[in-house]
């Protein structure tokens, strides 16, 4: 009996499989045509920014395809899931995959938060007004919230962030507002030992407020 009970407990933490059939999935409440157009513009500007920077300085690099492969995930998150901080809500926390930074800059350009001159300064942060290569809150404190490079840093930080929030909630030090911690991983990142270094902690601590996308 004890063995059977233990097996049932272990199964609770097994891999989750989405069993919702397509015909029962809820449709998006957004305008898909507009969202697809916006997504296309952001993908284009992201790639164009990297190309233009490398025409001036070929050694810059820039991971031209990373954002494109996850553009839909980021776009849906921005438009329908992620909630910003305000006076009544602490806000969701997003750990962006580091190599996808060009896409975040491209979106900010479309929203009017960055200008063309700044995009032309991608990966030239040693110059005034240059955009950092990766999410870097020390270099760009008004843009980035969390550092996620070197590779593997993002997933580990996200898990420990979720654990700390859970710790505070369980002790009544902060309110449980339903905030989520999102982490986006990829571009070979899972080969880094740090990427899986804290994954067991997420299971043991039952961190149901963390969402990890690979």
State what each model feature region is:
Residues 21-24:
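Flexible, low-complexity linker/boundary loops enriched in proline and small hydrophobic residues
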Residues 30, 34-42, 46-55, 66-205:
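Cofactor-binding active-site loop characterized by glycine-rich and histidine/acidic residues
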């Amino acid at each position: 009996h004890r063995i059977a009970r233990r097996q049932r407990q272990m199964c609770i933490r097994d891999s989750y499989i989405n069993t919702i059939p397509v015909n029962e999935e809820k449709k998006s409440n957004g305008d898909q045509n507009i969202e697809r157009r916006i997504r296309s513009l952001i993908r284009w500007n992201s790639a164009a920014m990297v190309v233009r920077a490398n025409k001036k300085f070929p050694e810059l690099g820039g991971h031209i395809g990373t954002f494109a492969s996850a553009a839909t995930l980021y776009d849906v998150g921005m438009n329908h899931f992620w909630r910003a901080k305000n006076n009544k809500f602490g806000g969701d926390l997003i750990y962006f995959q580091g190599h996808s930074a060009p896409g975040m800059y491209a979106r900010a350009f479309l929203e009017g938060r960055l200008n063309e001159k700044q995009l032309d300064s991608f990966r030239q942060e040693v110059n005034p007004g240059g955009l950092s290569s990766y999410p870097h809150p020390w270099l760009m404190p008004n843009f980035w919230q969390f550092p996620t490079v070197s590779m593997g840093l993002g997933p580990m930080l996200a898990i420990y962030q979720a654990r700390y929030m859970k710790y505070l909630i369980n002790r009544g030090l902060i309110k449980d507002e339903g905030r989520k911690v999102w982490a986006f991983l990829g571009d070979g990142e899972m080969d880094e030992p740090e990427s899986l270094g804290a994954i067991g902690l997420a299971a043991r601590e039952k961190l149901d407020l963390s969402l990890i996308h690979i």
